[in-house]
Amino acid sequence: LLIRAAEKIGVRIPRFCDHPLLAPSANCRQCLVDVAMPGRDGVVRPMPKPQPSCAMTAMDGMEINTQATSEVAAKAQAGTMEFLLINHPLDCPVCDKGGECPLQNHALELMASGAQSATRFTDVKRTFPKPLRLTSNILLDRDRCILCQRCVRFADQIPGDPFIALQGRGGGHPSYDMDGHPEHAGGLYSEQIGRFDARVLDFSTGSAEQTVDADLQTIPGVPALSALGAPTGPG
Protein backbone atom coordinates (compact mmCIF):
# COMPACT_ATOMS: atom_id res chain seq x y z
CA LEU A 1 0.00 0.00 0.00
CA LEU A 2 1.12 3.57 -0.67
CA ILE A 3 0.79 4.52 2.99
CA ARG A 4 3.13 1.66 4.04
CA ALA A 5 5.64 2.54 1.31
CA ALA A 6 5.64 6.13 2.57
CA GLU A 7 6.27 4.94 6.13
CA LYS A 8 9.30 2.94 5.00
CA ILE A 9 11.00 6.05 3.60
CA GLY A 10 10.03 8.24 6.55
CA VAL A 11 7.16 10.15 4.93
CA ARG A 12 4.21 10.65 7.27
CA ILE A 13 0.68 10.67 5.86
CA PRO A 14 -2.12 11.44 8.35
CA ARG A 15 -4.78 8.78 8.79
CA PHE A 16 -7.58 7.79 11.16
CA CYS A 17 -9.19 4.59 9.84
CA ASP A 18 -5.98 2.88 8.77
CA HIS A 19 -4.34 0.21 10.94
CA PRO A 20 -1.61 -2.24 9.84
CA LEU A 21 -3.51 -5.21 11.31
CA LEU A 22 -6.82 -4.37 9.62
CA ALA A 23 -7.87 -4.62 5.98
CA PRO A 24 -8.00 -1.29 4.11
CA SER A 25 -11.33 0.53 4.22
CA ALA A 26 -10.59 4.15 3.18
CA ASN A 27 -13.38 5.38 5.46
CA CYS A 28 -11.95 8.61 6.81
CA ARG A 29 -10.36 9.93 3.55
CA GLN A 30 -7.71 11.75 5.58
CA CYS A 31 -4.79 10.05 3.80
CA LEU A 32 -5.59 11.46 0.34
CA VAL A 33 -2.55 11.96 -1.90
CA ASP A 34 -1.98 13.26 -5.42
CA VAL A 35 -1.22 10.30 -7.73
CA ALA A 36 0.10 10.08 -11.28
CA MET A 37 0.32 6.69 -13.00
CA PRO A 38 1.85 5.45 -16.25
CA GLY A 39 -0.64 4.37 -18.89
CA ARG A 40 -0.29 1.55 -21.40
CA ASP A 41 1.69 3.90 -23.60
CA GLY A 42 4.12 4.55 -20.77
CA VAL A 43 3.10 8.18 -20.35
CA VAL A 44 2.61 9.22 -16.72
CA ARG A 45 -0.71 11.00 -16.26
CA PRO A 46 -2.21 12.45 -13.06
CA MET A 47 -5.38 10.86 -11.72
CA PRO A 48 -8.37 13.25 -11.80
CA LYS A 49 -8.90 13.18 -8.02
CA PRO A 50 -6.75 12.60 -4.92
CA GLN A 51 -6.61 8.94 -3.91
CA PRO A 52 -6.65 7.26 -0.45
CA SER A 53 -3.10 6.04 0.13
CA CYS A 54 -4.32 3.42 2.63
CA ALA A 55 -6.20 1.52 -0.09
CA MET A 56 -3.99 1.94 -3.16
CA THR A 57 -1.17 -0.46 -4.00
CA ALA A 58 2.23 1.01 -4.80
CA MET A 59 3.36 0.25 -8.36
CA ASP A 60 6.44 0.90 -10.47
CA GLY A 61 6.39 4.25 -12.25
CA MET A 62 3.92 5.91 -9.88
CA GLU A 63 4.47 9.53 -8.93
CA ILE A 64 3.07 10.32 -5.48
CA ASN A 65 2.80 13.75 -3.92
CA THR A 66 1.67 14.01 -0.30
CA GLN A 67 0.33 16.99 1.61
CA ALA A 68 3.92 18.19 2.01
CA THR A 69 4.58 18.52 -1.73
CA SER A 70 1.15 18.90 -3.34
CA GLU A 71 -1.30 21.73 -2.88
CA VAL A 72 -4.05 19.45 -4.21
CA ALA A 73 -3.40 16.81 -1.53
CA ALA A 74 -3.03 19.41 1.21
CA LYS A 75 -6.33 21.07 0.25
CA ALA A 76 -8.11 17.69 0.09
CA GLN A 77 -6.85 16.69 3.54
CA ALA A 78 -7.74 20.07 5.04
CA GLY A 79 -11.24 19.81 3.58
CA THR A 80 -11.70 16.31 4.97
CA MET A 81 -10.57 17.50 8.38
CA GLU A 82 -12.98 20.43 8.28
CA PHE A 83 -15.90 18.07 7.64
CA LEU A 84 -14.79 15.77 10.47
CA LEU A 85 -14.68 18.67 12.91
CA ILE A 86 -18.00 20.27 11.90
CA ASN A 87 -19.97 18.16 14.38
CA HIS A 88 -17.14 17.02 16.62
CA PRO A 89 -17.52 18.32 20.20
CA LEU A 90 -14.88 20.67 21.61
CA ASP A 91 -14.45 18.72 24.83
CA CYS A 92 -10.78 17.75 24.54
CA PRO A 93 -9.95 18.71 28.18
CA VAL A 94 -12.43 16.13 29.54
CA CYS A 95 -12.04 13.50 26.81
CA ASP A 96 -10.23 10.26 27.70
CA LYS A 97 -8.00 10.71 24.64
CA GLY A 98 -7.18 14.36 25.30
CA GLY A 99 -3.43 14.87 24.91
CA GLU A 100 -2.84 11.75 22.80
CA CYS A 101 -5.58 12.03 20.19
CA PRO A 102 -4.64 11.77 16.47
CA LEU A 103 -7.61 13.96 15.54
CA GLN A 104 -6.54 16.65 18.00
CA ASN A 105 -2.89 16.42 16.96
CA HIS A 106 -3.62 16.67 13.24
CA ALA A 107 -5.98 19.60 13.77
CA LEU A 108 -3.20 21.46 15.57
CA GLU A 109 -0.74 20.59 12.79
CA LEU A 110 -3.10 21.98 10.16
CA MET A 111 -3.58 25.18 12.14
CA ALA A 112 0.19 25.55 12.47
CA SER A 113 0.58 25.10 8.70
CA GLY A 114 -1.79 27.99 8.00
CA ALA A 115 -4.90 25.98 7.13
CA GLN A 116 -8.42 27.07 8.08
CA SER A 117 -8.31 27.59 11.85
CA ALA A 118 -11.84 28.94 12.46
CA THR A 119 -14.96 26.99 11.57
CA ARG A 120 -17.23 28.22 8.78
CA PHE A 121 -20.08 26.13 10.17
CA THR A 122 -22.76 28.37 11.68
CA ASP A 123 -25.50 25.80 12.29
CA VAL A 124 -26.07 23.81 15.49
CA LYS A 125 -23.78 20.81 15.99
CA ARG A 126 -25.32 17.36 15.74
CA THR A 127 -25.73 15.68 19.12
CA PHE A 128 -26.83 12.27 20.40
CA PRO A 129 -28.09 11.17 23.83
CA LYS A 130 -25.14 9.98 25.90
CA PRO A 131 -23.61 7.98 27.26
CA LEU A 132 -24.82 4.85 25.49
CA ARG A 133 -23.94 1.86 27.67
CA LEU A 134 -22.58 -0.97 25.51
CA THR A 135 -21.45 -3.19 28.39
CA SER A 136 -21.12 -2.84 32.15
CA ASN A 137 -17.68 -1.28 31.62
CA ILE A 138 -17.83 0.41 28.21
CA LEU A 139 -19.74 3.63 27.53
CA LEU A 140 -20.18 5.13 24.06
CA ASP A 141 -20.17 8.85 23.31
CA ARG A 142 -21.58 8.99 19.78
CA ASP A 143 -20.87 12.71 19.45
CA ARG A 144 -17.16 11.88 19.25
CA CYS A 145 -17.47 9.15 16.61
CA ILE A 146 -15.78 10.00 13.28
CA LEU A 147 -17.09 6.85 11.53
CA CYS A 148 -13.67 5.30 10.95
CA GLN A 149 -15.22 1.90 11.82
CA ARG A 150 -12.00 0.65 13.42
CA CYS A 151 -14.07 -0.80 16.27
CA VAL A 152 -16.34 -2.66 13.84
CA ARG A 153 -13.44 -3.92 11.73
CA PHE A 154 -11.43 -4.96 14.79
CA ALA A 155 -14.32 -7.09 16.04
CA ASP A 156 -14.85 -8.71 12.66
CA GLN A 157 -11.22 -9.28 11.65
CA ILE A 158 -9.19 -9.86 14.85
CA PRO A 159 -11.28 -12.02 17.24
CA GLY A 160 -13.62 -12.96 14.37
CA ASP A 161 -16.65 -12.05 16.46
CA PRO A 162 -18.56 -9.15 14.84
CA PHE A 163 -20.14 -8.12 18.13
CA ILE A 164 -20.57 -4.46 17.17
CA ALA A 165 -22.09 -2.99 14.02
CA LEU A 166 -22.61 0.47 12.58
CA GLN A 167 -26.09 1.00 11.18
CA GLY A 168 -27.43 3.52 8.68
CA ARG A 169 -25.61 6.03 6.49
CA GLY A 170 -24.49 9.65 6.65
CA GLY A 171 -23.46 11.99 9.42
CA GLY A 172 -26.63 11.59 11.44
CA HIS A 173 -26.61 7.83 11.75
CA PRO A 174 -24.04 6.52 14.27
CA SER A 175 -26.07 3.74 15.86
CA TYR A 176 -24.17 0.84 17.37
CA ASP A 177 -25.43 -2.67 18.04
CA MET A 178 -23.42 -4.87 20.41
CA ASP A 179 -25.45 -7.95 19.43
CA GLY A 180 -25.16 -9.38 22.95
CA HIS A 181 -21.49 -10.42 22.71
CA PRO A 182 -19.36 -8.47 25.22
CA GLU A 183 -16.51 -11.04 25.41
CA HIS A 184 -14.10 -8.99 23.31
CA ALA A 185 -15.39 -5.54 24.24
CA GLY A 186 -12.26 -4.74 26.25
CA GLY A 187 -10.46 -4.03 22.98
CA LEU A 188 -12.79 -1.14 22.19
CA TYR A 189 -11.31 1.15 24.81
CA SER A 190 -7.97 1.24 22.98
CA GLU A 191 -9.55 3.04 20.02
CA GLN A 192 -7.84 6.20 18.85
CA ILE A 193 -10.70 8.73 19.26
CA GLY A 194 -12.30 9.04 22.69
CA ARG A 195 -15.77 7.83 21.74
CA PHE A 196 -15.47 4.80 24.04
CA ASP A 197 -15.11 5.53 27.76
CA ALA A 198 -14.04 3.10 30.44
CA ARG A 199 -16.64 3.46 33.17
CA VAL A 200 -14.00 3.87 35.90
CA LEU A 201 -12.54 6.84 33.97
CA ASP A 202 -15.81 8.53 33.08
CA PHE A 203 -16.23 11.96 34.67
CA SER A 204 -19.90 11.30 35.44
CA THR A 205 -19.20 8.39 37.81
CA GLY A 206 -17.87 10.49 40.67
CA SER A 207 -15.01 8.02 41.01
CA ALA A 208 -11.85 8.98 42.87
CA GLU A 209 -9.96 7.46 39.95
CA GLN A 210 -11.03 10.10 37.41
CA THR A 211 -8.23 10.76 34.95
CA VAL A 212 -7.46 10.77 31.22
CA ASP A 213 -5.31 8.44 29.14
CA ALA A 214 -2.45 10.91 28.80
CA ASP A 215 -1.94 10.78 32.60
CA LEU A 216 -1.66 6.99 32.74
CA GLN A 217 1.46 4.83 32.69
CA THR A 218 1.55 1.78 30.42
CA ILE A 219 2.44 -1.63 31.85
CA PRO A 220 2.24 -5.12 30.29
CA GLY A 221 -0.93 -7.00 31.05
CA VAL A 222 -3.91 -9.00 29.81
CA PRO A 223 -7.34 -7.38 29.21
CA ALA A 224 -9.89 -8.65 31.71
CA LEU A 225 -12.68 -8.86 29.13
CA SER A 226 -10.62 -10.45 26.34
CA ALA A 227 -11.59 -14.04 25.61
CA LEU A 228 -8.33 -14.41 23.68
CA GLY A 229 -6.08 -13.49 26.60
CA ALA A 230 -3.98 -11.42 24.22
CA PRO A 231 -1.17 -9.33 25.75
CA THR A 232 -1.81 -5.61 25.92
CA GLY A 233 -0.47 -2.48 27.57
CA PRO A 234 -3.12 -1.04 29.90
CA GLY A 235 -2.58 2.25 31.65
Locate the predicted segments by residue.
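Fe-S ferredoxin-like electron-transfer domains
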Residues: 29-234
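A basic, amphipathic helix-loop patch mediating RNA/tRNA/ribosome contacts
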Residues: 2-35
